UniProtKB/Swiss-Prot annotation:
Residues 311-330 are annotated as: Disordered. Asymmetrically dimethylated at Arg-462 during flagellum resorption. Probably methylated by PRMT1. The keyword Cytoplasm applies. Keywords: Cell projection, Cilium, Coiled coil, Cytoplasm, Cytoskeleton, Flagellum, Methylation. The lineage of its organism: Eukaryota, Viridiplantae, Chlorophyta, core chlorophytes, Chlorophyceae. GO terms for biological process: cilium movement involved in cell motility. This is Tektin. It is found in: Cytoplasm, Cytoskeleton, Flagellum axoneme; Cytoplasm, Cytoskeleton, Flagellum basal body. PANTHER family: TEKTIN (PTHR19960), TEKTIN-1 (PTHR19960:SF25).
Length: 482
């Protein structure tokens, strides 16, 4: 096919026309017939050539138009498919971002709820620490005799240390939760920014897809979507997807870390609560047992004091009897001594160891011996009365200390808000509420209290029998002396 503006022989038509113009227009001269004929032939050749050139141009234009239409249609189809694929991919990433963002928001709410529960738990622990401190302070006011490192004191010290340690762990857990929330908030900000960009990208791509094939549309929508002055360099598709995947992967990492933290906190709180309730239950049992033991010991001391006072009364009665008997013997002794002294005044001739002399001497000796024995008994009874008085004073002092200790121990028990000792401690301070699961343990404790009561009763009976035996022995010893 000849090129445009050239003949089939390769002659350039522009140059040919320029040369043809030079051969025409010779005004005022004759031309040869040959030139005249040649001019027409050349012009006819030129016309034919122009016709061929025009036909060639029309064919080339038709082919170009067809190729251009096909190319444009294909390009538009490719762009539409690319936009549709991009919209689908962006929508998928947007959905994943929305799901992950919802999980992050939910996890932040769970962490804040965990923090609130920890703070409430720490408040209860601080209240228990206050009650425990008050108990230790009140218990320090017991009399010196009652200051013993008993199970109650050990339990209070153990509970104070345990509660302080748990309070420290709660504070550290709250700080860790705050750090975790800060990390999740940063993740949330990244996800929200990425989600906003994805939403805007969807809006832009949907607008691009909706632009019609119209010459008048150019310049109408682009100004409303034009980026700001701080343009950013374009990313590769791989980098674009990887950035979002990195955000999602980072979010899932912190979500898993937060879930592990909440699980660990829940496990630690459950264990500490179980340990705390167990220690509080044992402390409550020890306090009640201490009150019961102090009360029983005070009752035993009071019973013994009554026995000592009864023995004091009997000893004083015995002393009165001995004193009366001694007084009764002093008259006959004085009489016998006086008789013997008067009889010694007989003349020497009459100084005979006769029956009267022997009887008087024997009477004086018997009365002196009896008086001596009675005096010894009176002195012994006086010493015993003094010992009984001292014992009674010690018992009274001990009972007074036991009364003070009992009042202090009862006050210590009631510091948790109970009205009386029979009431169970509040569950927020001491132990769990009564349940069917604690029934076997309650029955066991009741059985232990019954056995302790039986043991106390048996001890009292034994002490009463020992006291009766001592009294019988004392009575037998006194009768033998007379």
């Amino acid at each position: 096919m000849p090129s445009y503006n050239h003949t089939s022989n390769g002659v350039n038509m522009a140059n040919f026309r320029a040369l043809g113009g030079k051969n025409t227009g010779r005004g005022g001269t004759y031309r040869a017939p040959y030139e005249w004929t040649l001019e027409s032939v050349e012009q006819m050749g030129l016309g034919a050539t122009e016709n061929r050139m025009s036909s060639t141009l029309r064919d080339a234009s038709s082919q170009l138009q067809a190729v251009a239409s096909a190319t444009v249609a294909n390009d538009i189809s490719i762009v539409d498919r690319a936009l549709t694929t991009k919209l689908s991919q962006t929508e998928s990433l947007k959905n994943m971002l929305e799901t992950c963002l919802a999980e992050v928001i939910s996890e932040i709410a769970e962490l804040l709820s965990t923090k609130k529960r920890l703070e409430e738990r720490n408040g209860k622990v601080q209240a228990k620490i206050g009650v425990n401190s008050n108990r230790m302070q009140v218990r320090s006011s017991r009399p010196p005799r009652e200051m013993t490192m008993d199970e109650v004191e050990k339990g209070l010290i153990k509970q104070q240390g345990m509660l302080g340690s748990f309070s420290d762990r709660v504070a550290r857990a709250v700080a860790q939760v705050d750090r975790e929330v800060a990390q999740l908030e940063a993740v949330r900000a990244k996800l929200e920014a990425d989600l906003r960009d994805k939403t805007e990208a969807l809006r832009v791509d949907e607008a691009v897809l909706s632009i019609p094939t119209d010459p008048t549309v150019e310049g109408t929508l682009s100004p409303t979507f034009r980026r700001g002055a701080a343009d950013c360099p374009p990313k590769t598709p791989h980098t674009w997807v990887r950035n979002t995947e990195d955000n999602l992967r980072n979010a899932h990492h912190w979500l898993a870390d937060s879930a592990r933290l909440r699980k660990a906190i829940a496990h630690a709180v459950a264990n500490s609560r179980a340990t705390e309730h167990d220690v509080a239950n044992r402390l409550n049992e020890n306090m009640l047992a201490k009150v019961a033991a102090t009360r029983n010991l005070r009752e035993d001391l009071q019973a013994q004091l009554e026995k000592v006072r009864e023995e004091q009364a009997r000893a004083k009665g015995q002393r009165s009897a001995l004193t009366s008997a001694l007084d009764d013997k002093r008259g006959p002794l004085a009489q016998a001594r006086e008789r013997l002294a008067v009889r010694k005044a007989r003349p020497c001739r009459e100084n005979v160891n006769d029956e009267v002399e022997a009887a008087l001497a024997k009477e004086v000796a018997h009365l002196a011996a009896v008086t001596q024995q009675l005096s010894v008994k009176v002195a012994a009874v006086d010493r015993e009365i003094a010992a009984l008085d001292a014992t009674a004073a010690q018992l009274e002092s001990n009972i007074a200390d036991k009364d003070d200790a009992l009042r202090v121990d009862e006050r210590v028990v009631l510091l948790d808000g109970r009205i009386n000792l029979a009431q169970r401690p509040p569950s927020s301070v001491a132990s769990f509420a009564m349940s069917d699961m604690s029934a076997p343990r309650t029955q066991t404790l009741a059985r232990i209290r019954e056995l302790e009561a039986s043991l106390t009763s048996a001890r009292r009976e034994r002490e009463a029998m020992e006291s009766s035996i001592r009294q019988l022995r004392d009575t037998m010893g006194g009768g033998g002396a007379f």
